Swiss-Prot record:
InterPro entries: Aldolase_TIM, Elp3/MiaA/NifB-like_rSAM, LIAS_N, Lipoyl_synth, Lipoyl_synth_chlpt, rSAM. It catalyses: [[Fe-S] cluster scaffold protein carrying a second [4Fe-4S](2+) cluster] + N(6)-octanoyl-L-lysyl-[protein] + 2 oxidized [2Fe-2S]-[ferredoxin] + 2 S-adenosyl-L-methionine + 4 H(+) = [[Fe-S] cluster scaffold protein] + N(6)-[(R)-dihydrolipoyl]-L-lysyl-[protein] + 4 Fe(3+) + 2 hydrogen sulfide + 2 5'-deoxyadenosine + 2 L-methionine + 2 reduced [2Fe-2S]-[ferredoxin]. It comes from Oryza sativa subsp. indica (Rice). Keywords: 4Fe-4S, Chloroplast, Iron, Iron-sulfur, Metal-binding, Plastid, S-adenosyl-L-methionine, Transferase, Transit peptide. It is an enzyme of class 2 (transferase). This is Lipoyl synthase 2, chloroplastic. It is found in: Plastid, Chloroplast. GO terms for molecular function: 4 iron, 4 sulfur cluster binding; lipoate synthase activity; metal ion binding. Its EC number is 2.8.1.8.
Amino acid sequence: MAAYCSRVYHHHPVSPSTMQGSLARPSIHAGSASLTFRARPNSVSIVRCDADSPPEGSAVAGWAPPGPYTGRDPAARKPAWLRQRAAQGEKYARLRESLGELKLNTVCVEAQCPNIGECWNGGGGAGGDGDGIATATIMLLGDTCTRGCRFCAVKTSNKPPPPDALEPLRTAVAVASWGVDYVVLTSVDRDDLPDGGSGHFAQTVKALKELKPGILVECLTSDFRGDLEAVSSLASSGLDVFAHNIETVRSLQRIVRDPRAAYDQSLAVLKHAKNCKDGMVTKSSIMLGLGETDEEVKQTMCDLRAIDVDILTLGQYLQPTERHLRVREYVTPEKFDFWKEYGESLGFLYVASGPLVRSSYRAGELFVQNLVRRKKAELAPTLQ
């Protein structure tokens, strides 16, 4: 979702499992009241959490397990480059009013994205006066997630409300009326649905393409529990960019993401989406500042390029509340510039890298639009 849109930690306890490798971490369980650490030379710390049940109503209250990876790190001070003005501007106000009237959710609001003013105003920062390319990421399937990743502000529940059957058409009508050329669709995780919500996603894409055939559609998806048939269903719906976030490096997956997510599962989803349709553009995103090393970031970028991911975004993790994961490091703008250059050297066709970059950050800017249209044009002769 994004935007980094995963969820407040809340799920049923799972049995601990041991992961192999020098950087492996065991499973983390919700409701931990007891945590133990083991440090090994030349490795990151390992944390094990013994599960208790979360308190009643915790999904709404924003409950997450306490421990050494939550709270505020006194050594980490938010630098000046992360300070943003409150969102304002005519375009921002108009878009927010329109979304409210149509009862459409956006990950921009639900995940507390720091770029909401810039994106909704068309690239002009919080106050407007940009290049006119406004981007809003519509969040389908409700505003309540079935997973509990420990970095996101989206509320969670094991039994969210059923999907709105009219949402695909309502979304398509709304987006078509805005006159935009590029739209991002995302969703909460819906493990309660047989297909993980891929059918609902696909209906929305098809409705958009019917109402506005020339529009470019990016879908920022969940992993659908690794169900590749669900991936195929969405990938063949007519979308132009298939995005799925790997979120963090391999060693931090169990600390950062819900245990139902996995590094290799995310790679498999992206690889399958790429192979589903000729010319498919794929995209992923990495958060920095969670305790990852440079070598781990490089390896993650190489793993994404090995499956031919085209677009990569890198941004600073920001802690939504005291109950979420601590920020371990504020990465400098200069280091983000390095990661952009490194990504381009690996062959990514487009890299957005900066402290406030999120996975849907200015997704529809002209370079990306031209990239997608060029790929479609290159493919056209083979389809005739």
